[in-house]
From Swiss-Prot:
Major subcellular site: secreted
Pfam families: Interferon
Keyword Disulfide bond recorded: yes
Gene3D superfamilies in the record: 1.20.1250.10
GO biological process assignments: adaptive immune response; B cell activation involved in immune response; defense response to virus; humoral immune response; natural killer cell activation involved in immune response; response to exogenous dsRNA; T cell activation involved in immune response; type I interferon-mediated signaling pathway
GO molecular function list: cytokine activity; type I interferon receptor binding
Keywords assigned: Antiviral defense, Cytokine, Disulfide bond, Glycoprotein, Secreted, Signal
GO cellular component: extracellular space
This protein's name: Interferon omega-1
Cysteines paired by S-S bonds: C24-C122, C52-C162
Glycosylation sites: N101
Length: 195
């Protein structure tokens, strides 16, 4: 009987600990969804990338600003959320629907929406959102500028198949290189200075 009471007490203590003290548990689910997103983006290839080499351009993805070492967890979440929203916005257009296989495009958008839902849940759990918003103005603005350059490029190239292919490859590269930022979501506040 004493064992049951002590077990019950342990459960009460564990279940009554504040949720806000727990880190947002996204890394495993985000990594799986990120891999699926990259797989779908790869499957969306319609033109051999080498045939579009003359159309290449540097959209200047702000890797230095997004390396993750500069941000606490809430800020990394906020910047990653902006990046996902921009990708959804880019691919959720009539012109995008005309350029891509709609089944793959729907899978891509569904996966991105799921990641956004996960990040929104995480942001809701985190404290200091006002502080994080102030700290991410520069990186968030850099992400917005990156996507603005992509949109201008597509407009200049009249949404050609090669232009979309160049954008698809660059989105894959930038999404893949955001791993450091996503890795920040798995670190506790005490780990912020860790490499």
């Amino acid at each position: 009987m004493a064992f049951s009471v002590s077990s019950l007490m342990a459960l009460v203590v564990i279940s009554s600990s504040p949720v806000s003290s727990m880190s947002c548990d996204l890394p495993a689910s985000l990594d799986l969804r990120k891999q699926e997103t990259l797989r779908v983006l790869h499957q969306m290839e319609t033109i051999s990338p080498p045939s579009c080499l003359k159309h290449r351009t540097d959209f200047r993805f702000p890797q230095e600003q997004l390396d993750g070492r500069q941000f606490p967890e809430a800020q990394a979440t906020s910047v990653l959320q902006e990046m996902l929203q921009q990708i959804v916005s880019l691919f959720h257009t009539e012109r995008s629907s005309a350029a891509w296989n709609t089944t793959l495009l729907d899978r891509l958008l569904a996966g991105l929406h799921q990641q956004l839902e996960d990040l929104n849940t995480c942001l809701d759990e985190q404290t200091g959102e006002e502080e994080s918003a102030l700290g991410t103005v520069g990186p968030t603005l850099a992400v917005k500028r990156y996507f603005r350059r992509i949109r201008l490029y597509l407009t200049e190239k009249k949404y050609s198949d090669c232009a979309w292919e160049i954008v698809r490859v660059d989105i894959m590269r930038s999404f893949s290189s955001s791993a450091n930022l996503q890795g920040r979501l798995g670190m506790k506040d005490g780990d912020l200075g860790s490499p």
